[in-house]
Amino acid sequence: MDEATAKSGTEQDGLTPVKPPEAELLVVTGMSGAGRSTASDALEDHGWYVVDNLPPQMLGTLAEIVSHAPKSIPKLAVVVDVRSKDLFTDIQTALGALSASGITFRVLFLDANDDVLVRRFEQGRRPHPLQGGGRILDGIGIEREVLRELREHADVVLDTSEFNVHGLATAITELFSDTGPVTLRLNVMSFGFKYGLPVDANFVADARFIPNPHWVPQLRPHTGLDEDVSDYVLGAEGVQEFVDRYVRALEPVLDGYRQENKHYATLAVGCTGGKHRSVAVAMELSKRLAQYPRVTVTTTHRDLGRE
């Protein structure tokens, strides 16, 4: 993992998970170009309600509103930065008012080396919000001075100089996710080929090589959710080997998805009508894949009942 600094009271080397207080309010700030947008996206992926570019004077009002609906918005992240121009000068006053009112919060400060920030602005072909008619580096210098006191009092200072987008998202996950390391949500979906391929499928497994229960009169009215049909499908020659090999083949792919900070994937299992074979195989694959670490499996049957 890329290096970062997590500071809680005193600065420490490496990433230390930050134990959340009772009130889940996180103020996200830091240098322009240090990755606030990526951090916001990562927080949203883990259930945080994110408000971007909020004037600091509105922090107390928003926190008060959310405090009356903790079940609706249990985790609130507010992004405040120099884009609010003159309004940002009141940030310390606003944070002091939060503390005085008894609202518990944390401050995440994202930072990066000047040369890295300059390169990111140049690559994005965007001016620094404070550079005016000067250079990007001039704007960075002004911003550092404006944010100096805020950085000194931040609960977490995260240096993103060595991070790419995925590395930063992973760091945010480790620091602020209730579940810790990245969890992949895998939806195993049965479907019928005659109704078309699922447009959101990352993988497609074809179960049409299995003998079709449709041609067995006593099984035809039932579905792959019924035990008799499931036993017939999963007991057919080659099916268990197919399932075993498919699960093994997916293991490095799912590991890679997590490393790339991908949170969602869909495995589609198809047969002709989506009633018998694909349903039974999807259920078996779901059971096997649910044993993977940090994989949450759901099962859906797109075309079941469509006939």
Swiss-Prot record:
Region span, Disordered: 1-21
Repeat keyword on record: no
Keywords, comma-separated and alphabetical: ATP-binding, GTP-binding, Nucleotide-binding
Binding site for ATP: G30, M31, S32, G33, A34, G35, R36, S37
Gene Ontology molecular function, alphabetical: ATP binding; GTP binding
Listed InterPro entries: P-loop_NTPase (IPR027417), RapZ-like (IPR005337), RapZ-like_N (IPR053930), RapZ_C (IPR053931)
SUPFAM superfamilies the UniProt entry points to: P-loop containing nucleoside triphosphate hydrolases
Domain of life: Bacteria
Protein residues bound to GTP: D81, V82, R83, S84
Pfam families the record matches: PapZ_C, RapZ-like_N
HAMAP family: RapZ_like
Record-stated family: Belongs to the RapZ-like family.
Function of the protein: Displays ATPase and GTPase activities.
PANTHER family (alphabetical): RNASE ADAPTER PROTEIN RAPZ
Name of the protein in its database record: Nucleotide-binding protein AAur_2084
